[in-house]
């Protein structure tokens, strides 16, 4: 019988992911809330690591002699020591499409919160001060307003769709994306970030 692969899950992941691990008899796994001494000892002979935002520095990665893959549960990898990962021959994966919509929706939430002065008006209503609306700062519409999206990867492309739904004028700065791609999604490319701001 082949030896089970050992997986360390650093910082909890969604229960469906845990259920997938539980349902596969070829894996054994352990969940750690943080990087601690116990984890440092167990990492030496683990085959895979799933990690969220905790820092995975050189001294930990370089001690993982059997490590084949680091699965970053998110889109960035600034918390992983890339040099050490490469040196031991491990593969680094990310969940590239996991949060683009969530982040774009959060940006829209913040834009609406700011433009509609949600917190001020909400507080006024909760206190029963309905006539205070004339004393509060005026709200503004997103319609017809200019917005600059700096970076036009998955999040930027998800955001432009939502901004256009509010009929905003969308300007995009990204030196790595061609004009046609931006134009095809309804944006106007700007080439100088300082000038655009």
Predicted segment positions?
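Short low-complexity, flexible loop/linker segments enriched in glycine and/or proline
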Residues: 44-47, 108-111, 185-188
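Residue-level detector of anion-binding/catalytic polar loops
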Residues: 28, 91, 113, 169, ...
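Short gly/ser/thr-rich secondary-structure transition/capping motifs
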Residues: 28-35, 51-52, 126-134, 183-189
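Phosphate-binding beta-alpha-beta segment of Rossmann-like dinucleotide-binding domains, i.e.
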Residues: 88, 96-146, 158-161
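Structured loop/turn residues at beta-strand edges in well-structured enzyme cores
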Residues: 44, 62-65, 116, 191, ...
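An N-terminal-biased, well-structured beta-alpha scaffold segment characteristic
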Residues: 1-93
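Rossmann-like dinucleotide/phosphate-binding beta-alpha-beta segment
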Residues: 135-197
């Amino acid at each position: 019988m082949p030896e089970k692969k050992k997986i360390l899950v650093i910082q909890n992941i969604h229960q469906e992911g845990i259920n997938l691990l539980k349902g596969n008899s070829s894996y054994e796994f352990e969940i750690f809330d943080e990087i601690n001494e116990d984890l440092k000892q167990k990492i030496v002979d683990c085959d895979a690591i799933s990690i969220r935002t905790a820092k995975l520095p050189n001294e930990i990665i370089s001690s993982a002699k059997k490590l084949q893959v680091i699965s970053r549960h998110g889109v960035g990898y600034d918390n992983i020591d890339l040099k050490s990962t490469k040196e031991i021959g491990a593969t680094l994966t990310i969940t590239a499409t996991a949060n683009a919509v969530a982040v774009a929706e959060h940006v829209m939430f913040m834009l609406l919160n700011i433009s509609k002065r949600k917190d001020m008006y909400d507080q006024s209503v909760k206190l029963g001060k309905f006539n205070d609306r004339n004393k509060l700062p005026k709200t503004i519409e997103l319609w017809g307003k200019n917005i600059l999206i700096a970076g036009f990867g998955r999040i930027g492309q998800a955001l432009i769709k939502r901004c256009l739904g509010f009929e905003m004028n969308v300007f995009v700065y990204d030196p790595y994306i061609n004009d046609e791609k931006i134009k095809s999604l309804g944006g106007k490319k700007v080439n100088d970030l300082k000038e655009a701001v």
